[in-house]
Amino acid sequence: MEHTYQYAWIIPFVPLPVTMSIGLGLLLVPTATKNLRRMWAFPSVSLLSIVMVFSADLSIQQINGSSIYQYLCSWTINNDFSLEFGHLIDPLTSIMSILITTVGIMVLIYSDNYMSHDQGYLRFFAYMSFSNTSMLGLVTSSNLIQIHIFWELVGMCSYLLIGFWFTRPIAANACQKAFVTNRVGDFGLLLGILGFYWITGSLEFRDLFEIFNNLIHTNGVNSLFATLCAFLLFVGAVAKSAQFPLHVWLPDAMEGPTPISALIHAATMVAAGIFLVARLLPIFTVIPYIMNLISLLGIITVLLGATLALAQKDIKRSLAYSTMSQLGYTMLAPGIGSYRAALFHLITHAYSKALLFLGSGSIIHSMEPIVGYSPDKSQNMVLMGGLTKYVPITKTTFLLGTLSLCGIPPLACFWSKDEILNDSWLYSPIFAIIACSTAGLTAFYMFRMYLLTFEGHLHIRFQNYSGTKNSSFCSISIWGKEGPEPVKKKLLLSVMNNNQKVSFFSKKIYQIDGNVRNLMRSFSTHFDNKDTSMYPCESDNTMLFPLLVLVLFTLFVGSIGIPFDQVGSDFDILSKWLTPSINLLHQNSNYSVDWYEFVTNAIYSVSISYFGIFIASLLYGSVYSSFQNLDLINSFVKIGPKRLFLDRIINVIYNWSYNRGYIDVFYATFLTKGIRGLAELTNFFDRRVIDGITNGVGIASFFVGEGIKYVGGGRISSYLFVYLSYVSTFLLIYYFYFLNR
C-alpha cells in the first residue's frame, strides 16, 4: 500500500505526453501529424485509463480503512523560507480522481467522432489532455501554492476550450468573459493565500489547519482579518463554480464544442470551486460568518439558476443554468454543515450532467444536416420536437438523465438531493422551503426541455416554417402573444402566421429571416420525398457508447451513498470512504437512517418533483392534441382582471428569465461602462492635466529662454555680466532677508 501511495505523484502527469507529442508533432512534422490525426484519440484514452485504474486502486484502499497519506519534498530557498511540494492522498482526492478520469474517458471517446470533421481535431485533444492534467494536479496538491498553480492552469485550459472556435466573434467574446470573470476570483484566491501565510507561516494543509484552529481558539489572530482572508479564498471558489454574482460567464461558455461543455460542467472547471471549499472546509467551519455566507450564496444560486432556465430556447444554455442551480445545492451543503451530502451530490450530478450534455451533443449532431451548422438553429429547441422515433437511444439516455436531475428514485441525483433537502430543514426552514421549491422548478424546466426536444412532431417539418402557405399548426405559449388586438392574448393555442416562428415559453413572436426561411423551404420541398437523409439520424456507435456507460453510472452510482442502517448490511460505502475526512472536521459520522424515516423524508421531495413534471407535461406535452376545437380551450380562458393580472405576472417571470435576471445588463451598464468612463477620465487627466503641466513648464522655459537670449546681444561677455548680476542679486536677497531675520 505504501508503495502505491509513493508513486501517486505521477497521476497528474500521465496524460501530459499526449499534449506534448501533439505540440511537437505539429511543430516538427506537421504534415505527418495531421495525416495521422485520428490515432491520437487512442493514447489520450489509454493514458487516462491508466490514471483511472490507479485512482480506483487508491479509492479501494481508502474505503478499506487506509488513513490520509501525504508526501512532501522541501525546497529550501534560505534559512527563513522554504517551499514544500508533494501530493496528498485522502478520500477527497480519490473521489475527485475517479470522477475526473471516468467522465474524461467518456468525453474523449465521444469526441473522437464528434470532432472528426473539425480542422482543430488535434488541437482539441491537446487541450483536453492538458485540462485533465491540470485538474488532476489540482486535486492531488498538498499545499496552497500547488493549488494556485494548477488552479490557474485549469482556468487557462477552460479559456482555450471555451474559445476553441476563436474565429467566431461570439466564441472569442465568451472565452474572454470567462477569463475576466475568473480573474476576479483568482485575485481573491491569491490574496487569501498570502493572508493565511502571513497568519500561520505555512501553506501546507495539515499545518495550516492545525495552526489556524489553535489561533482562533486562543484568540491569537484578529478575527476580522481572518474572516477577510477566508472570504478571499471563498471568492475564488465562487467564480470558478459559477456562483452568484460571478456566474455570468457560465451560459456564454456554451459557445465551445459540446464535449467541452460536458467536461467543464461535470468534472473540471466548475467542480474545482466545490473541491476548494471541501478542501478548506476545516478553515471555514471555525468562522461562522463564512459558513453563513457559503450557505446564503448557495441558496441564492439554487433559486437564480432555476428561474433563469425557465425561458431558455438553446438546449445547451438550459443545461448550463441547470448546472448553475445544481452547483448551488452542492455549495449549500457544506455551508449548512453537510460535507458528505456536498460530495455525494457532486458525484451524482457530474455523471447525470455529463450524460445530458453528451446527449444534447447527439441531438445537435442529428439536427445539423437539416437546419444547418449554426448553433442558433441546431441548438434551438423550437426547431426540434418529435425526435423520439429518429434518435431512440439518445432519447432514452436523455430521459434517464432528466429524471435523475429531477430527483426521481432510484436514479443517482435523488439520493444526494434528498439528503441536502433534509439537512436544510435542520439548518433553516426558509432555506429549506427555497431548496424544495427549486426542486419543483428543476423538474419543470428539465421536463420542459425533454418534451420540447423529443415529444410531439418535428417542428421544422410544418409548412408554416417554409413560408409556402398557412397552416393550422398550433403552439403552446403560456406567456401570451404581443400584438395590438386583445384577441391575440386570448388564445393559449395560437395559430402562427406563415412568416412567424413558434416561440415556446415566450411572450414574443419573432420574424424568421430570409436565410432561415429559404432553408426551411428547401426542406419542405423534400418533405414528400422518401429520402431519409433529410430526417434526423441516430449518432454513430462511438458517440452512443459513452451515453450508455454514463447511463449505468446514473442508475447505480447513487447506491454508494444509500443511508440505510440495517442489521447485517452496510450499504453506505460513501460514509466509509469519507471517514478520515469527516473525522478531521470533528463531525458526527453517523449518517444512517432507517427505512421508515427515509421514506417519510423522501415522499415530500419526490411529490414536489412529480408536480413539476406534471405542470411541464400539461403545458408542453401532447395533452392539447386531443382538443380539436379551439373554442373548447378558449372557453376556459376569459379575459378578466384575474387573467390580466396572471398575464402580467407571467410576463414578468418571462422577462426576468429571458434577460438573465438583468444581471448581465447591470454589469454592462454600471460596471463595464463605469470602468470605461473612469478610464476615459483618467486618460483625460493624464493627457490634459499631468502632461499639460510638464509640457507647459517646458514651453514656458523655451519662451523665457528665447526672450532673454537677446539681452546680451550675442556677446559672451554680456552673457557673463547678466549671469553674475542675477547671481549677486539673489545672494544679496538671501543674505539680507533670510539670514538677518
Swiss-Prot record:
Alphabetical UniProt keywords: Chloroplast, Membrane, NAD, NADP, Plastid, Plastoquinone, Quinone, Thylakoid, Translocase, Transmembrane, Transmembrane helix, Transport
Membrane topology annotation: Multi-pass membrane protein
Any one Gene Ontology cellular component term annotated for this protein: chloroplast thylakoid membrane
EC number, UniProt record: 7.1.1.-
Subcellular location field: Plastid, Chloroplast thylakoid membrane
Transmembrane segments: 9-29, 40-60, 89-109, 122-139, 147-167, 185-205, 219-239, 258-278, 280-300, 396-416, 425-445, 544-564, 603-623, 719-739
Sample GO molecular function, one term: NADH dehydrogenase (ubiquinone) activity
Biological process, per Gene Ontology: ATP synthesis coupled electron transport; electron transport coupled proton transport
Domain of life: Eukaryota
Family statement: Belongs to the complex I subunit 5 family.
SUBUNIT field: NDH is composed of at least 16 different subunits, 5 of which are encoded in the nucleus.
Protein's name according to its UniProt entry: NAD(P)H-quinone oxidoreductase subunit 5, chloroplastic
Biological source species: Liriodendron tulipifera (Tuliptree)
